From Swiss-Prot:
Predominant cellular place of this UniProt entry's protein: cytoplasm
Positions bound to Ca(2+) 4: 204
Spans traversing the lipid bilayer: none
Binding of Ca(2+) 1, residues: 88, 91, 93
GO cellular component, one term: cytoplasm
Source species: Mus musculus
Name under which the protein is recorded: Calpain small subunit 2
CDD domains in alphabetical order: EFh_PEF_CPNS1_2
């Protein structure tokens, strides 16, 4: 067994060390397409009109049987579920290719973000850190959780991209990370910049989202393992490899 020590607010160096090896994702463009344009159009409407809001990491989504949750759903969520059902197919899950098509369809409607889109490799990375049941795909609750986060983070990106360059510079990025709900120490912040920013220190939208998806997943994983809430976790080598290798 070995001990991974971290404080969730990011002030302790242990969090920087623990998360540093887990940071991955990012990538360049690959166009979405296929025969799902009509279905995607319906889903895109739910993200295109997102209101500005700050993000606070939430508990991981719980998988529930459709009949349990449908009775208490709002009309918007019910319509969203119907669109998801058409897109997901009989297994009721979406994979990395479907996710790439959806995200790039959304980005095509937001020219101000000035990004070429998400690559398939980036979407595989996003799926892996969001895939709580390790099926290699996202179920409805996982997908909805991701979707809601992207809506909020899109608003944060727009708010801090004050020069409309499509990229967050060093001074903008610090504020954007805090507005997204992540209080990071300087060591971890610099590691993130080195991993996700370009040579000039700027971070575009798809790398910003990739970074926050992974940060959110790592915070949630730590909280789940820190059962007595003392800021310490103890994991076996097998648990550590399962946590780090798949994500």
């Amino acid at each position: 067994m070995f001990l991974a020590k971290a404080i969730l607010e990011g002030a302790d160096r242990g969090l920087g060390g623990a998360l540093g090896g887990l940071l991955g994702g990012g990538g360049q463009a690959r166009a979405g397409g296929g025969n799902i344009g009509g279905i995607l159009g319906g889903i895109v409407n739910f993200i295109s009109e997102a209101a500005a809001a700050q993000y606070t990491p939430e508990p991981p989504p719980q998988q529930q049987h459709f009949t349990v949750v449908e009775a208490s759903e709002s009309e918007e969520v019910r319509r969203f579920r119907q669109q998801f059902t058409q897109l997901a197919g009989p297994d009721m899950e979406v994979g990395a290719t479907d996710l790439m098509n959806i995200l790039n369809k959304v980005l095509s409607k937001h020219k101000e973000l000035k990004t070429e889109g998400f690559s398939l490799d980036t979407c595989r990375s996003i799926v892996s850190v969001m895939d709580s049941d390790t099926t290699g795909k996202l179920g409805f609750e996982e997908f909805k959780y991701l979707w809601n986060n992207i809506k909020k983070w899109q608003c944060v990106f727009k708010q801090y991209d004050s020069d409309h360059s499509g990229s967050l510079g060093s001074s903008q990025l610090h504020g954007a990370m805090q507005a997204a709900g992540f209080q990071l120490n300087e060591q971890l912040y610099l590691m993130i910049v080195r991993r996700y920013a370009d040579e000039d220190g700027g971070m575009d939208f798809n790398n910003f989202i990739s970074c926050l998806v992974r940060l959110d997943a790592m915070f949630r994983a730590f909280k789940a393992l820190d059962r007595d809430r003392d800021g310490l976790i103890q994991v076996s080598i097998r648990e550590w490899l399962q946590l780090t290798m798949y994500s």
